[in-house]
Regions:
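Short, small/polar-rich loop/turn modules that mediate ligand/substrate recognition or access, typified
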Residues: 170, 175, 247-249
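A short, exposed helix-loop element centered on a Lys and neighboring polar residues
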Residues: 117-118, 163
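Short C-terminal tail/terminal secondary-structure segment
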Residues: 91, 225, 236-237, 248-262
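Alpha-helical segment proximal to the catalytic Tyr-Lys
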Residues: 122, 167-168, 245
């Protein structure tokens, strides 16, 4: 299927590894030009039809600078993918999570997307429309314990923003949707200081045992495995495509059947 993305201009945040890098590769494979932002851009060097920009997307100015780069380079922004985010496991639960830690979670998972969206929407309105895909999380509506209380609250705010903006800007040609992954085989879960290792240290077990224990405690996957970054990217690119031109304000879960409720 032709996703009709050839020649389109896409901006991707947190694009240098994991889900973000997979999204960049998937967009390029569909013929899009990608302006890709991250703190470190070594992994993006030399990629065809990719303009990397080293930028702090957690800063007040960073997201708008990335969008401005796309406008400078290509004169338009057809697609924005807000992939910026981060989680730090809060072993002390709600009472052990400070205002500063909540502020960090909101900065990483909500305000970065808000700022990039504001800049992109301003441009999209001048050109007659565009598509925005926010990478949220199942933690926006699924909290097995207090360990991700700040992260979940920030992602819930992002999902709410998506719904609100879809109503405001849908009549003006801008579509906005969410993709909410469950656990994905990236460094966030499996890397150094990732969720599995952090839980394992607290429990006195290794990271593999901790990963199995955490997943079992929340009901396990129907598919029996983590989602891959490439699978998330496929869903993101589909929602960015003009082929899904009447899809907006929706939240698509990709979690291997982790969530059991309707």
């Amino acid at each position: 299927m032709d996703l009709e993305l050839s020649g389109k201009v896409a901006v991707v945040t947190a694009a240098s590894k994991g889900i973000g890098l997979s999204i960049v590769k998937a967009l390029v494979a569909e013929g899009a030009h990608v302006v890709a932002g991250a703190r470190s851009i070594a992994s993006l060097a030399g990629m065809e039809r990719v303009t990397p920009l080293a930028v702090d997307l957690g800063s007040a100015e960073g997201p708008a600078l990335l969008v401005a780069k796309a406008i400078e380079q290509h004169g338009r922004v057809d697609v924005l993918v807000n992939n910026m985010g981060g989680v730090r496991l809060r072993l002390g639960g709600f009472l052990g999570t400070s205002d500063e830690e909540f502020a960090w979670a909101l900065q990483m998972n909500f305000f970065s997307a808000l700022r990039a969206t504001r800049a992109a929407v301003t441009q999209m309105l001048t050109q007659g429309g565009g598509a925005i895909v926010n990478v949220a999380s199942v933690n926006a509506f699924f909290q097995p314990d207090g360990g991700t209380v700040d992260y979940g609250a920030a992602k819930a705010a992002l999902v709410n923003l998506t719904k609100s903006l879809s109503q405001e800007f849908g009549p003006r040609g801008i579509r906005i949707n969410d993709v909410s992954p469950g656990p994905v085989s990236t460094d966030l879960w499996l890397g150094e200081d990732g969720v599995a290792q952090t839980v394992g240290k607290a429990m006195g077990i290794d990271a593999d045992a901790a990963r199995a224990k955490v997943i079992a405690s929340i009901g396990g996957f129907a598919t029996g495995r983590f989602t891959t970054p490439e699978e998330v990217a496929t869903l993101v690119v589909m929602l960015a495509s003009p082929r899904t031109a009447n899809v907006t304000g929706s939240n698509y879960v990709i979690d291997g059947g982790l969530i059991k409720t309707l």
